From Swiss-Prot:
SUPFAM superfamilies: Radical SAM enzymes
Protein name: Probable dual-specificity RNA methyltransferase RlmN
Organism: Treponema denticola (strain ATCC 35405 / DSM 14222 / CIP 103919 / JCM 8153 / KCTC 15104)
Additional remark text: Reaction proceeds by a ping-pong mechanism involving intermediate methylation of a conserved cysteine residue.
Reactions catalysed according to its record: adenosine(2503) in 23S rRNA + 2 reduced [2Fe-2S]-[ferredoxin] + 2 S-adenosyl-L-methionine = 2-methyladenosine(2503) in 23S rRNA + 5'-deoxyadenosine + L-methionine + 2 oxidized [2Fe-2S]-[ferredoxin] + S-adenosyl-L-homocysteine; adenosine(37) in tRNA + 2 reduced [2Fe-2S]-[ferredoxin] + 2 S-adenosyl-L-methionine = 2-methyladenosine(37) in tRNA + 5'-deoxyadenosine + L-methionine + 2 oxidized [2Fe-2S]-[ferredoxin] + S-adenosyl-L-homocysteine
Gene, per the UniProt record: rlmN
Length: 347
């Protein structure tokens, strides 16, 4: 794979940027390079419609990629987790999820670490280094496609808070959706936030084609403040108004994600609070039984506990689903990312 020890990589550029950066006279040459990158080549040598001399010059002067796979793990359920080393030696993690219908979803990271400090999340416990560049985001998707073939969806639910890195995420999305490249439909892309209202408004005002998910977890203000410190500066009332605004601007329903923890947010009172929060919203509820994280004292709810909670919500007319456990044995399930990064990075 063509990698050099600096952060500027062609994978994070549009065709016109490649043309300018590489000093190419012909626009179509840049488009050819852009298409090759999206096709998953590992080096300039594989770009067979470029002359040998051009490939040699490009190889000597430029870098296709700025990241490489440090570690690859595969769960028996088909989940793949990659630890990806960045140009500066930092490590992030990205996951491939395959559902029962064989749809493949890339769960990508947008930051090295995470500053949000959610109490139930591994990534929130390991600290924060920096935002990722568009190339570092795009390359996660490309690495996963090389491992597993063509992917169907992208969710920004890996390491980091997407609303703190929207410019680079937006660029990465537009690169992957570019008609002369990967041409991925934006409707197959979801951005998940812990509840940073400013970012939700910013997304809404762009007239988003992508989907929004919000990690709600609980609609009890006091409990949510303890579990998710973001609540202290972005209250539940403010969050609900931001979601309503997104509904109105996008004509899309928002997914509310609830990480369920045994004896903490799964009783009838917790359900009633979620039902009340959801009133007036175009939303879908995704229940996520908590995945064990070493060093954290939360517990996974029993199946009976989850089913009872489901019933409360369904009786209120809410549309819900419960996420299947995938990737637990390799630390690749929701809330578990960061084990390799914690060993490798200096937070």
């Amino acid at each position: 794979m063509t990698i050099k020890k600096y952060k500027t990589a062609l994978s994070g550029m549009f065709p016109e940027e490649i043309q300018s950066f590489c000093g190419l006279k012909e626009k179509f040459r840049a488009q050819q390079i852009f298409h090759w990158i999206a096709s998953g080549v590992n080096s300039f040598d594989e770009m067979t419609n470029l002359s040998f001399d051009m490939r040699s010059k490009l190889k000597n002067d430029f870098s296709l990629f700025s990241t490489k796979i440090k570690e690859a793990l595969k769960d028996k359920d088909g989940t793949i987790k990659l630890a990806v080393e960045l140009y500066d030696g930092s490590v992030i993690e990205t996951v491939l999820l395959t559902d029962k219908a064989k749809r493949k979803t890339a769960c990508v990271s947008c930051q090295a670490g995470c500053p949000m400090k959610c109490a139930f999340c591994k990534t929130g416990q390991i600290g924060f280094l920096r935002n990722l560049s568009a190339s570092e985001i795009v390359e996660q998707f490309l690495h996963l496609e090389r491992e597993a073939g063509s992917l169907d969806n992208i969710v920004f639910m890996g390491m980091g808070e997407p609303m703190l890195n929207l410019p680079e995420i937006d660029k990465a999305i537009n690169i992957l959706a570019h008609p002369k490249g990967r041409n991925l439909s934006k409707r197959r892309i979801t951005i998940s936030t812990s509840g940073l209202c400013k970012g939700i408004y910013e997304m809404a005002d762009k007239g988003p084609e992508v989907r929004l998910a919000v990690s709600l977890t609980t609609a009890d203000e006091t409990l949510r403040s303890e579990l998710m410190p973001i609540t202290k500066t972005n209250s539940l009332d403010e969050l609900k108004q931001a979601i309503k605004y997104f509904n109105s601007k996008s004509n899309k329903r928002v997914t509310l994600e609830l990480a369920l923890m045994k004896g903490l947010n799964t009783d009838k009172k917790a359900a009633q609070e979620v039902i009340e929060f959801a009133k007036g919203l175009e939303c879908f509820i995704n229940l996520i039984p908590w995945n064990p994280v070493e060093g954290l004292n939360f517990k996974t709810p029993s199946e009976t506990e989850v089913r009872t909670f489901e019933t409360y919500l369904k009786k209120a007319g809410l549309n819900i689903s419960t996420r299947q456990k995938r990737g637990q044995s390799i630390g690749g399930a929701c809330g578990q990312l960061g084990s390799t990064a914690a060993r490798s990075n200096r937070f």
